[in-house]
């Protein structure tokens, strides 16, 4: 291109003096360089960083951000193709290979698909790409498995066999409110309103909501708090000094051990949440109210808890068909 500038200057030599020709050449070179700067293409890593920043601003939890990041990083490292050149065929092949190599369930692969789809949809919305390659890759069909809940008898067994006031209070609060274990361990004593039997929890994306507990839970919570000798503001703390805030893993381990000791199948915090939701729906609570209590943004998520109890089906059949 510099040769063309020289050619222009030479053609103007007949009408311009030396000083003017020199100035013309400077102006042409300057403007040419400014207007023809080649923009450096955005790297795949940079696209991912922009996406993660956007999700952070939207209020996604640290756990969700980490899952997005690890999922998409793995995909980009395996594909080794600039994002703008990634096609639907490439993505299908990646998902097939992922399932074969890891021998994972269809549910796991669909979770991966959903995360990657969110990434490309965001790129499309932000005009970084023309069309998401995930548009034609639909939800992977999985087997509909009816997940078990904790029976009334099992709940009473768990209560009766708690070795500490803390564990009894945890079981009552989980069963009564249906809160997530992550919400449980973040609770402070100050969050509990004993008069109204309610508390404020911070759910996914730090969304605040109000949940309610029964009289039995109120009694056991008070007994546990009154028995403590520490000054920690946390509602639930470790059993021994220095009495740190209880962690998610601590709750999970404690419940799992108690369940095994009683020969109960798969006792974990989320099972109490599922049980509470199922019981509420069975007793006639409107699904919209259950959604509010559980803190679901989509009612479809709540509908997954509307498990049809086979015993109830049998009773209804005997009632109407006998």
Regions inferred by a protein language model and the residue ranges of each:
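N-terminal core-binding DNA-recognition domain of tyrosine recombinases/integrases
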Residues: 30-39, 46-146, 227
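Catalytic-site neighborhood detector that most strongly recognizes the C-terminal catalytic loop/helix
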Residues: 38, 149, 204-205, 294, ...
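Short pre-functional
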Residues: 73, 117, 168-182, 198-199, ...
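Basic, Lys/Arg- and aromatic-enriched nucleic-acid-binding interface segment
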Residues: 129, 144, 152-181, 205-207
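Conserved tyrosine-mediated DNA breakage-rejoining catalytic core shared by Y-recombinases
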Residues: 177, 186-220
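Active-site/catalytic core of tyrosine-dependent DNA strand-transfer enzymes
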Residues: 214-264
């Amino acid at each position: 291109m510099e040769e063309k500038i020289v050619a222009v200057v030479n053609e103007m030599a007949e009408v311009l003096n030396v000083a003017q020709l020199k100035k013309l050449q400077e102006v042409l070179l300057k403007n040419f360089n400014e207007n023809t700067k080649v923009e450096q293409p955005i790297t795949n890593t940079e696209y991912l960083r922009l996406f993660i920043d956007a999700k952070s601003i939207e209020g996604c939890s640290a756990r969700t951000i980490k899952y997005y990041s690890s999922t998409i990083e793995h995909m980009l490292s395996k594909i080794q193709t600039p994002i703008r050149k990634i096609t639907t065929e490439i993505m299908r092949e990646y998902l097939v290979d992922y399932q074969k190599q890891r021998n994972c369930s269809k549910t796991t692969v669909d979770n991966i698909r959903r995360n990657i789809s969110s990434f490309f949809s965001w790129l499309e919305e932000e005009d970084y790409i023309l069309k998401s390659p995930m548009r034609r890759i639909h939800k992977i069909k999985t087997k509909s498995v009816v997940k078990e809940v904790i029976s009334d008898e099992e709940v009473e067994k768990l209560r009766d066999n708690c070795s500490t006031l803390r564990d009894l209070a945890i079981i009552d609060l989980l069963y009564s409110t249906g809160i997530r274990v992550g919400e449980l361990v973040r609770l402070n004593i100050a969050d509990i309103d004993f008069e109204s039997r309610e508390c404020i929890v911070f759910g996914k994306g730090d969304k605040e909501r109000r949940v309610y507990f029964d009289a039995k839970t109120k009694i056991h919570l008070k007994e546990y708090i009154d028995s403590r000798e520490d000054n920690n503001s946390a509602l639930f703390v470790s059993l021994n000094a220095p009495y740190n805030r209880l962690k998610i893993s601590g709750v999970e381990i404690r419940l799992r051990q108690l369940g095994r000791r009683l020969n109960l199948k798969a006792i974990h915090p989320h099972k109490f949440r599922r049980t509470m939701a199922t019981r509420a729906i069975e007793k006639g609570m409107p699904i919209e109210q259950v959604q509010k209590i559980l803190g679901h943004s989509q009612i479809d998520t709540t509908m997954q808890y509307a498990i049809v109890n086979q015993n109830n089906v049998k009773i209804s059949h005997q009632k109407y068909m006998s």
